[in-house]
Amino acid sequence: VQWSSSERSVISGLWAKVNAAEVGPQALARLLVLYPWTQRYFGKFGDLSSNAALMGNANVAKHGKDLLLADLKAVKNMDNVKALYAKXXXXXXXELNVDPDNFTLLGDCLTIVLAMKFGADFTPVDQAVWQKFVAVVVSGLSKQYF
């Protein structure tokens, strides 16, 4: 994937304003609420029985933050995302049997959370660049499936 300097600037600018401890848990909880079948991967996380339980679950919050911190590594290594996610892709495919479409769903949930957080500052251009970044991350996480 080729990244223009303006695209790199948009991605790094967005991430400079992201609080992983806030946005990550919101995105993961949104995924688990909107797509309840994804909860099957998180059986050890405790109570996932309601929206309130999901939003207040400390394990969901920690994992959401960790996922966002992993994405931050991708921001810092935009030219090498597939190699960066090689180990996580192998674990997600071979050990956890995660449906790769769930990565896209999580990326969509993250996009929604960012749009809500940034409002008008999350311009259509920013969203287009962000969606490109999400597609690269999803591709990196999905490469073990194909």
From Swiss-Prot:
A Gene Ontology annotation in the biological process aspect, one of them, is: hydrogen peroxide catabolic process
Q: What residue stretches are annotated with the Globin domain? A: 2-146
Superkingdom of the source? Eukaryota
Keyword Heme recorded: yes
Query: What keyword terms does UniProt attach to this protein?
Result: Heme, Iron, Metal-binding, Oxygen transport, Transport
Does the UniProt entry include the keyword Iron?
Answer: yes
Give the residues the record marks as binding heme b: 63
Q: Which GO terms describe its cellular component?
A: blood microparticle; haptoglobin-hemoglobin complex; hemoglobin complex
Task: Spell out the Gene3D superfamilies in the cross-references.
Answer: Globins
Query: Which GO terms fall under molecular function for this chain's record?
Result: haptoglobin binding; heme binding; metal ion binding; organic acid binding; oxygen binding; oxygen carrier activity; peroxidase activity
Q: In which tissues is it expressed?
A: Red blood cells.
Q: What does this protein do?
A: Involved in oxygen transport from the gills to various peripheral tissues.
**Similarity comment text for this entry:** Belongs to the globin family.
Subunit organization: Heterotetramer of two alpha and two beta chains.
User: What's this protein's name?
Assistant: Hemoglobin cathodic subunit beta
User: Which species is this UniProt entry from?
Assistant: Ophisurus serpens (Serpent eel)
